[in-house]
């Protein structure tokens, strides 16, 4: 049966997808056969219905195969009907425009081809485009973009003559402001394509359109690029472009007046219809000056660095001018209602100000902090251009300011991380590049938790990127910046190694080796905790990678910091993967990949040093082979980073890197030759060969036997100076100036050769040339290391003054500070040494450094503390450091923490005696250069820092420094802060250090010094400590007072003297009595006073006063929050006059830091006992001693050993006889719990036992041990084992349930620690923390709790703020209406801030907390919510109504139940 149009119309109108796919090809065959489809051209009505069905049902089908088939059928209809299809365009074009925005590339491409075909065969381009203008305003952004791309294709196929472009350009100009970046890019590409065809008239026309200048600048730049590229196609008459009446693309030009209005058929056929479909591979994009990458939206670091300076020039006339500019910028950026182009201009202006030197102004950093919120808002903007500019500006700030951008980087980093998974490439890549730049330039430890927390993201893309960031961080940062977060890094890398995503795993393995280069012990520990399969994967990753810690391509390509120009040269890897580095090989076997030799031309003791290093390096496990030694084993300025080496290389010779001045040096690995060590590899680095002398050559002789004896002689011929050696070297040796004898210690035999050659080359005109390497010769001191002193005698005055007795002209002082700093930052030790010499010159010339130079120099010096070349560089560094501190001490307050802690750490290292003396000198200068109180606070912070694990030598150094500091401090410098209390408690435990008597003695002396410094304040501090600590300190002070009284009575000169404070001439404080001077011995007259006025009775009276003050002062130190301070004169008089023994009081409420007036009065009464004679007479000097039994009840076994150093033998006999009771069981548990990060299983058991005890109502245990238990539990929350952390929280929760009243004085500390536990990476710990926080909310006084929580809610980050808000909501349920009214102004700001938080859970918790407040005070809450927007207020009201409904239902149901 013949199938006609009716049949096919029925097939087209059916809905079944499967049948459509079957019918489609048959319909195409039908249309191709003109004989079968003869009725197609006869029945117009059926044709209209068929085209309508194809356009609406097929082309618009959700199944892309059906849509493609529909377009194929339409294409055949166009071919068949030609001009007659023109009547169907109104039906077809809307559907085809919709398909230009299809998600499938194939659909979009075929759609574009069909449109081009319609323009060619059914109509003309102008006719079609006049009906497609609505596509420029289509709701789908892909359609808008597709219409632009279709226009580009039309221009490429038909030229500009075919279109009236003046009608189209306004639509394109509208798209330049489109919200979507891809549409904006496509619109710009359209204009560029029009410019290619039309020429300069486009530029003139656009200037009249009223476009913003910034937008025009971008477009005109593209025009210029196209013009320079030579791809212009001027196919239209210029004069007609901007004249709407005369421009008609259909009008034939003079050159082709007889031609058809359509382009010739052959010309159209010659162009492929698919050449201009998408911006990526299209010819259009290629012709428009390389806009393909921009069309895709991706950015890289090169784009950022180019954009850094691509900003308008501005000038800053004053700090006020800068402040006004930044205020305007903040005002624009803080309001997202401003035009987005204004915001982009504001962001660019920040970069302009930076380039104009804004960082030099003091108020810049204060203003920059105020911009944090504006930056966050910009980074969250919906417009990609704003986000892009914000990220570029953040990257620029980081690269210019470095670590001074710490606060801004920390604030903005979480927001920028949210950009990483963004589907818009421009936003995602902007965020990624900004993070990379911040990591590279701003080395702030607080960024590490932000990065590691994102490593556990649910998004695979985010995890991959985060491990990339972590890898970059481990490559770029110095070890000291990572130390605080070692455990977090290890845990994160472990998770990465176990990650489900294979790519994330690979990067995590790379991170592991970067981590190993900083913390080998921790890395090895992590390695052993992994399953064998993961261990094998790590080792195979090491073997298979030719560059384990290699820099990513983007890192190698660009970096704007000056350090990047001098980035340390990497160790070279041979094809087998073995590392040739300065570190000694761990195997005694010499392999081709690890050939090394001692550098005897540099150091006369190098052979011995090399052997010792090799021996010490052989114990590394589990990495036995040289290949397993990670690059960068030295955490120093010259830390190694590997670079990729050609896989084709088969020799063990390293490739030739170029140094910072452009010269290339070949580090040849060679065998030692018998003739001369001047041919050694190091010699090739250090000297240049000028030629061979033609005259007779002399061998210098040592003038005396003494000198011969001091220079070690080698018995072979390899080290003897020879004529050939001098001839070879004489013209390349740099001349030496006159240098003081203290500095003339030769650090290498090269210097000896230089001195000898200088003496031989007098009068030679060729020696006038400038030296190759030594540019900065010092006027001051050289290093005088003991190890190098053998050659010092050869360095005589004559050999240095042989150049006419003066400093040569080339030894000039350079003003090129940047070059000096570049040398100091070099990876080559000799260049670092050279830089230090230049720096000494600068400092001695009183050349003060700018703020930026100081900042950079501090960063370099921080790295130099870990320099491995102690004999060559570190000693000179210490000398330079002393000068630097003396000259710039007023500008180094921010760097003091690093300076002081690093110097103290160095005191614990194995250094030569001379180097250690220089470290000590640096410490002395530091102590005298900075405020004492600031140094004291830093030391207290350092002692309590749990990330620091000082060895015994470092502990001694810290304690001695504190002692010397205390002898110079003013009493007011000693502040009783929480940090000081923790530090003092740790010093008390150091008095029982079992491994070192030096530590014990130094700790005891420090406690005595602090007691003498400010007796009342120190007494208050002891009162706030747990009783066990109090007892240990009090016993020690008892013995000290007794001993000092005996010694002062016997011999006044034996009394310990104290250096007078530089702040005041008198040591007495208002709270100290005259007898306190006996502790310090300020002057001979004061000593006489002590001898005359002090007797044993007075000493014991003083001691009793001190002890009573410790025990009693805090009874009045904390009063109930709801009651005013009441003074009971009777009690006060009793406190002041009664003769109390040393036994412990009954109450446990002894600790308190916030002293109220009554508490201070009580303390003053107690300390006043130091002035009074005791009411009783004593029978003898030992008539009033400590009663050991009074102490034994409250001293656990740990404290007994702690006090062995400070008690007498007869006291110890009594201590041993104490029987063990229930209290001793708790003491043993506490002793076990004090083994932090050790004995995991035992401590778990101890915590379980403690959990049982907490449930028993044993008053004596809590009276005695509560403070100690609490302190240990809170400290245990920082334990490495997550199970122990969770268990500690459960014990804490149980104590809160059973002993809530005891937490009154420790509320703030307990709340803070519990909330911090919510950040834990283990769910078990977080769950325990939530339970503990819930119990806390119900246990502590509501007002006290809220006062602690309010500042936390306002300042803390997620998840701490979330936990605090939830806790506050529970507390509000317990508070009275009146009390809530009073503290409402403190509560509301934090909740409103939380309502705006990016985390939905924080917003939700804030709303619930506001609902809880409303349920207490009702409508009185409304005035506080005035700043909420309408939508937020609406949401809040909705939740309030729900809560009211729920409450009414529950109350009615309870009423029903009671009546029933």
Swiss-Prot record:
HEAT repeats lie at residues 87-124, 163-200, 407-442, 443-479, 942-979, 1272-1309, 1390-1427. It is found in: Cytoplasm, Cytoskeleton; Cytoplasm, Cytoskeleton, Microtubule organizing center, Centrosome; Chromosome, Centromere, Kinetochore; Cytoplasm, Cytoskeleton, Spindle. InterPro entries: ARM-like, ARM-type_fold, CLASP_N_dom, HEAT_type_2, TOG. Gene3D superfamilies: Leucine-rich Repeat Variant. Residues 237-293, 545-605, 640-733, 778-800, 1041-1084 are annotated as: Disordered. Its main location: cytoplasm. GO terms for cellular component: basal cortex; centrosome; cytoplasmic microtubule; Golgi apparatus; kinetochore; microtubule organizing center; mitotic spindle; spindle microtubule. GO terms for molecular function: kinetochore binding; microtubule binding. GO terms for biological process: cell division; establishment of mitotic spindle localization; microtubule anchoring; microtubule nucleation; microtubule organizing center organization; mitotic spindle assembly; regulation of microtubule polymerization or depolymerization; regulation of supramolecular fiber organization. Disulfide bonds: none annotated. Keywords: Cell cycle, Cell division, Centromere, Chromosome, Cytoplasm, Cytoskeleton, Golgi apparatus, Kinetochore, Microtubule, Mitosis, Repeat. Residues 279-293, 550-569, 645-659, 789-800, 1042-1054 have a biased composition (Low complexity). Microtubule plus-end tracking protein that promotes the stabilization of dynamic microtubules during anaphase. Plays a crucial role in chromatin-induced microtubule formation. May also act at microtubule minus ends. May be involved in the nucleation of noncentrosomal microtubules originating from the trans-Golgi network (TGN). Belongs to the CLASP family. This is CLIP-associating protein 1-A.
